[in-house]
């Protein structure tokens, strides 16, 4: 079934004289939706309301859930006629067949962008161990492996420990700078200098891949998730990162790599006519755990490729200032549930001080203030109640 161009309804105007139900048209959602609010105020319910309609309307969606509660409910409510479209990456389930390889099927002209996204994701999660030498060596390893046909994250470690493998990879490289690094610079490193540079990489990546389930997902799945194909075919990707079971670092890195790949897959649609780019919507709960500056900067590009992001989290200052400005500056619809004092002051200014700090501090659960994108233009801020999932 072709996707339907129906609006996604999610709110009712909170006015005695105006109780209209409202929502967003698909074209306005390509300008992205940013959702913020304290725990327990209704964010999860809003995301559920929206994604259930997307599936019913025939759209392709991805939902990245750090805990699994929301995607479990969504999975149980997928319309029967769409169940064949589901790819459920349930990370803690040792029997699930799906996996994801961030190094595979990257077009040559996209390698620099992919490498930057992968490195930023690793730096975000492994920041306590990050250093200039570590980044330099890791960058050259990632660039080299992105040129290979069937590389996996485990091959990063092989680049350091297996001289024959390193030589085989190096001989096939098209990038002369990366080739020179491995043939000349790396080979000149003393044992101690080399060991100091790669020890943290081996420790961090080794710990990630020592979990048998994560290793299988990242290096040897029965079925590889191909995000670009899922976009073009309008499929449903549900991701349970199970942070409480696999650990925060592992869940955050896998989520950040997935979000980066969604962006890269979207931009690879440049080769497809605008009218043939099927709408695709990506939901990210606890957005701050998975976003990098590369991802935030992609927001301005994604709308051209008919991909809309729905990013939700609890506190503005969970985001670094440059990421915060990039996300808010490129989100056409901004939705606020109840906030803390610091965030209320910031959002009041974002809403042009039409909404006071006190208004944002005192919102009841499932009540919101928002700026809504309507036919390509943001509305004035107004108050509303969110609709329950149906």
Question: Locations of the language-model features?
Answer:
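C-terminal regions of RecA-like/P-loop NTPase motor modules
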Residues: 1-8, 316-390
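Conserved H-loop
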Residues: 66, 312-318
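P-loop NTPase motor domains
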Residues: 2-19, 26-28, 33-41, 46-307, ...
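Catalytic or ion-translocation cores adjacent to nucleophile or general acid/base/metal-coordination motifs
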Residues: 308, 313, 332
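Short beta-strand elements
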Residues: 23, 228-229, 383-388
């Amino acid at each position: 079934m072709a996707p339907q161009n129906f609006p996604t309804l999610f709110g009712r105007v909170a006015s005695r004289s105006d109780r209209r139900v409202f929502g967003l048209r698909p074209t306005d959602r390509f300008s992205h939706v940013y959702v913020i609010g304290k725990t327990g105020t209704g964010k999860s319910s809003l995301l559920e309301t929206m994604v259930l309609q997307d599936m019913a309307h025939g759209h392709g969606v991805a939902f990245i859930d750090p805990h699994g509660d929301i995607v479990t409910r969504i999975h149980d409510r997928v319309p029967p006629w769409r169940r064949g479209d589901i790819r459920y990456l349930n990370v803690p389930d040792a029997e699930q067949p799906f996996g994801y390889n961030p190094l595979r099927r990257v077009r040559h002209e996209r390698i620099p962008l992919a490498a930057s996204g992968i490195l930023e994701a690793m730096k975000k999660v492994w920041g306590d161990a990050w250093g200039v030498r570590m980044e330099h060596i890791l960058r050259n390893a990632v660039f080299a492996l992105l040129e290979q046909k069937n590389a996996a994250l485990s091959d990063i470690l092989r680049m350091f420990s297996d001289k024959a493998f390193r030589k085989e990879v190096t001989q096939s490289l098209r990038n002369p700078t990366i080739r020179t690094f491995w043939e000349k610079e790396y080979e000149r490193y003393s044992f101690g200098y080399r060991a100091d540079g790669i020890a943290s990489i081996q420790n961090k990546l080794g710990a990630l891949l020592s979990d048998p389930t994560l290793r299988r997902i990242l290096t040897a799945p029965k079925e590889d998730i191909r995000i670009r194909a899922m976009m073009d075919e309008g499929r449903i990707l549900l991701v349970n990162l199970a942070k409480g079971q696999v650990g925060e670092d592992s869940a955050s890195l896998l989520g950040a790599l997935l979000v980066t790949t969604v962006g890269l897959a979207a931009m690879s649609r440049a080769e497809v006519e605008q009218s043939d780019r099927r709408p695709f919507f990506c939901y990210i709960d606890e957005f701050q755990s998975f976003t990098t500056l590369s991802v935030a900067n992609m927001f301005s590009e994604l709308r051209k490729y008919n991909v809309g992001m729905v990013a939700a989290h609890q506190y503005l200052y969970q985001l670094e200032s440059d990421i915060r400005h990039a996300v808010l500056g490129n989100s056409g619809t901004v939705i606020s549930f109840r906030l803390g004092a610091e965030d209320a002051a910031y959002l009041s200014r974002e809403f042009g001080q039409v909404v006071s700090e006190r208004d944002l501090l005192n919102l009841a659960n499932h009540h919101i203030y928002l700026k809504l994108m309507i036919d390509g233009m943001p509305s004035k801020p107004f108050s509303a109640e969110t609709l329950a999932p149906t």
